[in-house]
Amino acid sequence: MTSLNIMGRKFILERAKRNDNIEEIYTSAYVSLPSSTDTRLPHFKAKEEDCDVYEEGTNLVGKNAKYTYRSLGRHLDFLRPGLRFGGSQSSKYTYYTVEVKIDTVNLPLYKDSRSLDPHVTGTFTIKNLTPVLDKVVTLFEGYVINYNQFPLCSLHWPAEETLDPYMAQRESDCSHWKRFGHFGSDNWSLTERNFGQYNHESAEFMNQRYIYLKWKERFLLDDEEQENLMLDDNHHLEGASFEGFYYVCLDQLTGSVEGYYYHPACELFQKLELVPTNCDALNTYSSGFEIA
């Protein structure tokens, strides 16, 4: 989200009507776990005796607080339901306090996955963005860059209307991803048609130190102050917009999140910086990720 222009009241109300049970939907924490008979499991398998597994449809974690897919020998300590982050969004001229809470995680495990369901959902809170609200709370959805269905270059994403808000020109994708500094220069030719399409297995992204995502704020969540402002077009989110999206990088070693907000009409490279804030409550004292 950024300070720019007004999001239409009509759009917000229409989305709210279509999602009248949104609170119930997005407060449930779940992950998709493959069944024991699924023959498409990757060749590496988690050792269940060595780690606790976060069960589908529950809000419980094991004593070691390791959030693990049954099909992967990997802990996802900093990408799991219930985790909260705190930090800031800043630019040359602005600074805002930001809070993020992860509600659901549903990562793609298979190379042939074609689901368009968001891989991550949660709430995004930004404070003192507008002169009429102390804070603005939105629901965001996100997709992981898995180098197959969702590569770095969004022009190669599925041509689906639901994904249009994540789209950007090749040059914009390249200039933003390069700011993270974790890629070799050989991967960044703007003239190559297959920019960003690496020869990775779909689940390989989980075994890397850095997980890359795109986050998109979809609509406002119910809030007493925000609801009252919807009655007045002249004041509703005056000076603010969440029409753009974020390029995001999660460091699996430290849990830190770095991101950049993008919209063609906004100041470029507004930086998002977050760190986990409730690790004690979830017993996540350190990451299980190891650098090979």
Swiss-Prot record:
Substrate-recognition component of the GID E3 ligase complex recruiting N termini and catalyzing ubiquitination of proteins targeted for degradation. GID E3 is regulated through assembly with interchangeable N-degron-binding substrate receptors induced by distinct environmental perturbations. Required for the adaptation to osmotic or heat stress. Required for the regulation of protein levels of the adapter protein ART2, a component of the ART-Rsp5 ubiquitin ligase pathway, part of the plasma membrane quality control. GO terms for biological process: negative regulation of gluconeogenesis; proteasome-mediated ubiquitin-dependent protein catabolic process; protein catabolic process; protein catabolic process in the vacuole; protein targeting to vacuole; response to osmotic stress; response to starvation. This is GID complex substrate-recognition subunit 10. One of its GO terms (cellular component) is vacuole. Pfam families: Vac_ImportDeg. Belongs to the GID4/VID24 family. InterPro entries: Vacuolar_import/degrad_Vid24. Substrate-recognition component of the GID/CTLH ubiquitin ligase complex. In the absence of stress, the complex exists as an inactive anticipatory complex (GID(Ant)), composed of VID30/GID1, the E3 ubiquitin-ligase RMD5/GID2, VID28/GID5, GID8, and the RING-like subunit FYV10/GID9, awaiting a substrate receptor to form the active E3 ligase complex. When cells are shifted to glucose-containing medium, the substrate receptor VID24/GID4 is induced and becomes part of the complex, named GID(SR4).
